[in-house]
């Protein structure tokens, strides 16, 4: 079965992510561990953690994915911001391990005036420090593919390969975001473009290291370098790009997570649209 789900709210109590996932008929879910646009960290009670584990077992929703705060910038040249980001990631990863969350997705950082090579080095050094403080046994640390706006690092397979290289023995991997890669210049909505991107991933990162797919259409044109998500089939990617991913013999084994605009019942509608694109037999490569 192809697992399709959405990003859900974790407000009030973390265990409620499973209630919210069940309400929309999600097979898998993603959520924030704390407010993504605030440095404030909310400590979770033992009771809340126990409820989280209990509801996960009861609902059968799996895999479970946490997304990092948007404030973190592991590439920053500002030592205060970078240290704050490192400590924030450590805190979030420790909670992921405690709750046995499967995947932790992060936007690695922005160069903001640095050369790309310097920004990449800063990210690698930051992650080394993080892994010296947190040993990942249950959770995979996933770099998200990014659109390339405002100096984002992680927009190409080459950049992601550099970020992955020092951590081959760790629980690391990649989360592919369809909107981001399309906006970054990978034309995944035609056959040649999709298989070219698939081949690049395979050679430079290894398909086995791709763990999650963020399923988002794009409000902006191809190669726009802008991160603007749209409902499935209503953006410039169109249905074809999602059909390629959902029916690919490898990608269809992964969780597909919607991060489309949160209006009315659109998570339900978007999941239905994705499910209609699934064929019985995968397309072999």
UniProtKB/Swiss-Prot annotation:
Cofactor(s) of this protein: Zn(2+)
Family: Belongs to the AP endonuclease 2 family.
Pfam families in the record: AP_endonuc_2
Protein keywords: DNA damage, DNA repair, Endonuclease, Hydrolase, Metal-binding, Nuclease, Zinc
EC number: 3.1.21.2
CDD domains recorded: AP2Ec
Catalytic reaction(s) noted: Endonucleolytic cleavage to 5'-phosphooligonucleotide end-products
Cofactor note: Binds 3 Zn(2+) ions.
Binding-site positions, Zn(2+) 1: 67, 107, 144
Protein name per UniProt: Probable endonuclease 4
Described function: Endonuclease IV plays a role in DNA repair. It cleaves phosphodiester bonds at apurinic or apyrimidinic (AP) sites, generating a 3'-hydroxyl group and a 5'-terminal sugar phosphate.
Residues annotated as binding Zn(2+) 3: 180, 227, 229
Gene Ontology terms describing biological process: base-excision repair
PANTHER family linked to this entry: APURINIC-APYRIMIDINIC ENDONUCLEASE, ENDONUCLEASE IV ENDODEOXYRIBONUCLEASE IV
Residues the entry annotates as binding Zn(2+) 2: 144, 177, 214, 259
GO MF term (any one): deoxyribonuclease IV (phage-T4-induced) activity
